[in-house]
């Protein structure tokens, strides 16, 4: 796997993409979705946002609740099977077809900006 994407201006990236750390407060099944997803409520300190996240292959709901995630919070709202997803929880392919969520090495305050 090579990295084939063109370079972008780093300052522009940091201006345009707002990533924040939040704590998962709830993770519910989402049987209405076409893919295996959870309905998450993520606490960003000043507000709670909801997200449709494809983390079902790697995490039980109990594992997610209380964990910190990194999410993109300025993509607008996307409706998934009638559910309004207000942020994108970031993740990485685990090499076995699952997704692991991105987090911080140490706990940080909810709402902390990621650079």
Residue positions per predicted region:
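Phosphate-backbone binding interfaces of nucleic-acid-interacting proteins
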Residues: 1-115
